Amino acid sequence: MAAARAAALGVRWLQRTTRGVVPLEARRAFHMTKDMLPGSYPRTPEERAAAAKKYNMRVEDYEPYPDDGMGYGDYPMLPNRSQHERDPWYQWDHSELRMNWGEPIHWDLDMYIRNRVDTSPTPVSWDVMCKHLFGFVAFMVFMFWVGHVFPSYQPVGPKQYPYNNLYLERGGDPTKEPEPVVHYDI
């Protein structure tokens, strides 16, 4: 009982002392402001124009996510392209992400940054890549089959041991003289 009371008093004391150290608004500094959050789904052309202006887009280019209950609201549906596809020599405001200030961010930006998914077109088409892969696999299977049918072994001599072919260690009679063993130099 006394330990629980002491713990409760210690927690209250810690809360009182940290109030003076930590600024009051520090806990709110990481939240998104209301104007950063997506608004409701635009139903009229005027709402679409206002949402396009909010995201620094032309009305012709603005297309919101479908209103399917996922909570996207008026956020623009940007093309699913990675940051790799953007011009690396352009003077971006944020060169690591290849983005400019005020530019709308893709909803799945964490998936399309440069060290994740690369959606840029490949220089070789898929059918050519598949032909190369299956050709290599077929060649390797053929080579393994040839190695299995026609085995190749290097000729070897009998195993050579030092000290007269380990005569005593292999159970030889210590009273008899072992036969001399000829060792071959390679």
Swiss-Prot record:
The keyword Mitochondrion is annotated on this UniProt entry: yes
KW Membrane (keyword) present: yes
**Keywords noted in UniProt:** Electron transport, Membrane, Mitochondrion, Mitochondrion inner membrane, Respiratory chain, Transit peptide, Transmembrane, Transmembrane helix, Transport
Cellular compartment(s) = Mitochondrion inner membrane
Q: Which InterPro entries match?
A: NDUFB8, Ndufb8_metazoa
Give the superkingdom in one word.
Eukaryota
Q: Which GO terms describe its cellular component?
A: mitochondrial inner membrane; mitochondrion; respiratory chain complex I
Q: What is its main location?
A: mitochondrion
The record, for PANTHER family, names: NADH DEHYDROGENASE [UBIQUINONE] 1 BETA SUBCOMPLEX SUBUNIT 8, MITOCHONDRIAL (PTHR12840:SF1), NADH-UBIQUINONE OXIDOREDUCTASE ASHI SUBUNIT (PTHR12840)
Please give the subunit comment from the record.
Answer: Complex I is composed of 45 different subunits.
Name of the featured protein: NADH dehydrogenase [ubiquinone] 1 beta subcomplex subunit 8, mitochondrial
What's the source species for this entry? Mus musculus
Lineage start: Eukaryota, Metazoa, Chordata, Craniata, Vertebrata
